[in-house]
Swiss-Prot record:
Role of this protein: ATP-binding RNA helicase involved in the biogenesis of 60S ribosomal subunits and is required for the normal formation of 25S and 5.8S rRNAs.
Domain Helicase C-terminal: 330-505
Coiled-coil spans in chain: none
Species annotation: Ajellomyces capsulatus (strain NAm1 / WU24)
Transmembrane segments: none
Listed name of the protein: ATP-dependent RNA helicase DBP10
Length: 900
């Protein structure tokens, strides 16, 4: 058979078919993607038979042309959305799930999804630290749908997702419905406030996925005696909030009923100690997933620390907002644009600020202010709104919907300032943030890192401003040692400072702060509500100060010398351009006057004036006591300075030295005793080497990354509560309370174990040994089964019984046949005339129907569909029984017996 020559003409669609002989990934993707028509590529025509004279040269030209085409494709695809190698396609998901992910709008997995999904598909327990908005919901929903695949005909649920609130559970259900659209998986929502009977029906329909709050799910577990042995996949969403809201007892009881072969996932914004203990008890060799960006301070973040007095703290905050950050007062640009859009739009909006807010983003003035308690949040919000700022606020006990609205306003740029507590800000993720203000200085360096980690992201610069009182100085020194940066007080250095690499401390300009302090004093005198909020905030701060973590002993010793130094009250170098030399001298004089302490007590003054009100030996005792205190103070101050000088601390903590130099330094020290141990036989309690690689090699675990205990030790961070409840600032001080019924003091434990009386307060021990409410077993499920005529529910592993239920609403729709007159149109709407014509037409149809003789038969036919008029055997039996009872009651003979 003779060979055919290659046709010099291009294909019908002007595509060179010779490329198909050398199929590559780029060529196939180019075929699938519609593109513009191009000219025939004459350089790519291939001589298949090799009849050409330049065989080797042709191959080289062909290869070069292919490479040029590939480079051209890559350059043309820049800036377009393409399927990347690191996308969801590389995770090994099925086609239906990939289609649902694409329909949802996800193209590339987020960092938490990229790290979590492969581990979950590998059947490993995971503890993920992720904030709200980081894509954590899809991180556990996508592998769950991939593993469950389709509905199981065997009875028993296979996945359980526990959420702290109803709103979060609804969001999770929405994501599960959207991503599981291509499957026949059944999912149910079990939250408080819904009908128990409906939830009995949902559970009887054999759902695959249960999304619930812990309280209601435990109620159903006890009431229905649920067997959870079929559950393979458990998720604790927002686990830190689960523990904060008091669900620890319910979680322990639920965890006890789950099989040991389950896979458990735990997602949290922070990692408290109680959560670490729960994870160690309930998870099997968990892996901690933590994004590095959340644990480090950005090198682009610049820090400023301002020393203030307690009475000037509000004025200092107003000065920072007005003069340093320069936040404008009044309505924001985003709010003005939203109002303009509402004004020019034809349809009336329910909310003025939500018309086009999703296109906005935080501005360069966006600032988060961190406070200690929820009372400080209310107090500062009132002050700042009175000052004219656009403010949002959030704290732990704020309603979920209100919190979402407030945070969304800040994200959209409608407000410039967000006042929050550490507990409320734990799961908030702001994409672009310029400034962070620590109104109350954090008690742990980790909390400081957690706060300021929200700014200076993605290569952008940011600022953090902290207000430091004298009582906060030890915590500031702890932070300085934690960061390993030198401490600079005031303007002592006299050189250009780098605020990103140094801890620079100084005061604010006194005259400017005084103006805002006077304004605050006037406001407190005029506004009674703000004055009351201030008193409540002071009381809350006292409780907070009692329960916050204490600073290290060395920092407490060093803090006294730092506060008493002259540089402590010097103006911060940030205000170098504002104050002149004369102003600096004025500041020094005011600082000396402010720190003045009299040398004599009232006893010496009275003795010098010749007063005889006190015995003469009182002044001698006072003199001796004062001299002794002075000697003690001088000795302690000298001892403190010798133990912890600035240079020694910088050398020790910022720049660690090798063991050889330390040994030389120690041998030259005169106060150290000589060591008599023999190095050949002596075994020290400290490791001989500091090699991290050597420690990993000797370790019995597979690696430090998989060792949850070691990883969680670094990530653990306890946040103090933001309100004075028993779960917020610690246990109540008194362990007794007054019982009105018994007329005596009783132990508070009675409130916890249910022994204070009343059936509603009784507690019983569950399967795990913890006490749960006795009202969980009320018999309503038995009554529901009796009403539905269900003898026995199928057991786990048996085939599901048909007709038990259809799961969540969404099956057969109810058809409403009720005819209702249209509403009276609103005169102020733009479509008033249109609605008015509709109303008149409806009235005309109703009038015609009333005078139409055929409409009655039609109406009768419609109503006859609802209820049959034929009586059943049971109806006839009941009617006869009622008639017989009526006869006996009346005691009259029948009409037939009258004629006899």
């Amino acid at each position: 058979m003779p060979h055919r020559d290659v046709s010099p003409a291009a294909s019908e669609n002007e595509f060179d078919i010779s490329n198909l002989l050398f199929k590559g990934q780029d060529d196939l993707s180019d075929l699938e993607r519609p593109s513009k028509k191009r000219k025939p590529q004459e350089t790519l025509i291939l001589d298949v038979m090799g009849d050409g004279d330049d065989g080797a040269d042709g191959d080289e030209e062909f290869i070069a042309a292919q490479q040029t085409a590939a480079n051209r494709k890559a350059s043309n695809l820049r800036g377009r959305t393409v399927k990347k190698g690191g996308g969801f396609q590389s995770l090994g998901l099925n086609a239906a799930l990939l289609k649902a992910i694409t329909r949802k709008g996800f193209s590339v997995p987020t960092p938490i999804q990229r790290k979590t999904i492969p581990l979950v598909l590998d059947d490993q327990d995971v503890v993920g630290m992720a904030r709200t908005g980081s894509g954590k919901t899809a991180a556990f929903v996508i592998p769950m749908i991939e593993k469950l695949k389709s509905h199981s005909a065997k009875f028993g649920s296979r996945a359980l997702i526990l959420s702290p609130s109803r709103e979060l559970a609804l969001q999770t259900l929405k994501v599960v419905k959207e991503l599981g659209r291509g499957t026949d998986l059944k999912s149910v929502l079990l939250v408080g406030g819904d009908s128990l009977e409906e939830q009995f029906e949902y559970m009887a329909s054999n759902p695959d996925i249960i999304i619930a709050t812990p309280g209601r799910f435990l109620h159903l577990k006890v009431e229905m005696s649920l067997d959870l042995s079929s559950i393979r996949y458990v998720v604790f969403d927002e686990a830190d909030r689960l523990f904060e809201m008091g669900f620890a007892t319910q979680l322990t009881e639920i965890l006890h009923g789950l099989p040991s072969s389950r896979q458990t996932l735990l997602f949290s914004a922070t990692l408290p100690k109680s959560l670490v203990e729960f994870a160690r008890a309930g998870l099997q060799e968990p892996i901690l997933i933590r994004l590095d960006a959340e644990s480090k301070i950005s090198p682009d973040l610049q820090n400023a620390f301002f020393t203030v007095k307690s009475s000037e703290k509000e004025g200092a905050l107003l000065h920072v907002l007005h003069e340093v950050i320069k936040i404008p007062t009044g309505e924001t640009e985003a709010l003005k644009r939203a109002k303009e859009e509402v004004k020019h739009s034809k349809k009336r909006k329910r909310s003025e600020v939500t018309s086009n807010s999703h296109k906005e983003s935080p501005t360069e003035h966006s600032t988060i202010i961190f406070t200690a308690t929820k009372h400080h949040v209310d107090y500062l919000t009132s002050i700042l709104r009175t000052s004219g700022f656009a403010v949002s606020y959030a704290y732990g006990s704020l309603d979920q919907t209100a919190r979402k609205i407030e945070v969304q306003n800040f994200r959209d740029g409608i407000t410039h300032i967000l006042v929050v507590t550490d507990v409320a800000a734990r799961g908030i993720d702001i994409p672009i943030l310029s400034n962070v203000i620590n109104y109350d200085f954090p008690s742990q360096p980790k909390i400081f890192v957690h706060r300021v980690g929200r700014t200076a992201r993605a290569g952008k610069t940011g600022w953090s401003y902290s207000l430091i009182r004298e009582s906060d100085t030890p915590y500031l020194l702890d932070l300085q040692l934690f960061l390993g940066r030198p401490l600079i007080l005031g303007r002592g250095s006299g050189q250009q400072l780098n605020y990103a690499e140094n801890v620079v401390v100084g005061s604010l300009p006194r005259d400017k702060v005084a103006r805002y302090t006077e304004w605050m004093t006037k406001l407190l005198d005029e506004d009674v509500d703000i004055e009351l909020q201030r008193e409540v905030a002071i009381k809350g701060e006292k409780l907070y100060m009692r329960t916050r973590n204490s600073a290290s002993g060395e920092s407490a010793k060093r803090a006294k010398a730092v506060v008493e130094s002259a540089e402590w009250m010097m103006v911060h170098p940030l205000f170098n351009d504002e104050s002149s030399r004369l102003e600096e001298q004025r500041e020094k004089m005011l600082a000396r006057v402010g720190g003045y302490k009299p040398q004599e007590t009232i006893f010496e003054i009275s003795g010098r004036r010749g007063a005889n009100h006190h015995p003469p030996d009182d002044s001698d005792d006072a003199n001796e006591l004062r001299d002794f205190d002075g000697e003690n103070d001088n000795a302690i101050a000298a001892d403190n300075m010798s133990l912890a000088s600035d240079s020694e601390l910088e050398v020790t903590f910022s720049y660690p030295q090798s063991g050889k130099s330390n040994s030389k330094k120690d041998t030259n020290h005169p106060n150290l005793r000589e060591s008599f141990h023999n190095p050949e036989y002596f075994m020290s309690y400290t490791p001989a080497s500091n090699s991290l690689a050597e420690d990993r090699a000797y370790g019995v675990h597979s690696g430090s990354n998989t060792n949850f205990v070691e990883s969680s030790r670094i990530a653990t961070m306890d946040l103090a509560g933001d309100e004075s409840t028993s779960r917020g600032f610690g246990e109540p001080r008194s362990i007794m309370r007054w019982d009105k019924r018994q007329k005596k003091y009783v132990s508070r434990r009675n409130d916890e174990d249910g022994s204070k009386g009343g059936k509603s307060d009784l507690l019983v021990r569950g399967e795990s040994g913890v006490k749960i409410a006795a009202s969980f077993r009320s018999g309503r499920f038995d009554a529901w089964k009796k009403g539905k005529r269900i003898g026995r529910m199928p057991r786990v592993g048996e085939a599901e019984a048909p007709g038990l239920g259809s799961g969540m609403p969404g099956g057969k729709k109810y058809r409403h046949r009720k005819e209702q007159a249209p509403k009276t149109p609103d005169k102020f709407r733009g479509d008033y005339e249109k609605k008015k014509k509709k109303l008149e037409a409806a009235k005309q149809r109703e009038t015609e129907k009333a005078f139409d003789p055929s409409s009655g038969a039609k109406k009768a036919a419609v109503t006859s569909r609802g209820k049959s008029e034929l009586k059943t055997v049971e109806d006839i039996r009941k009617a006869r029984k009622v008639k017989e009872l009526r006869k006996q009651k009346n005691a009259r003979p029948s009409k037939k017996g009258k004629g006899r």
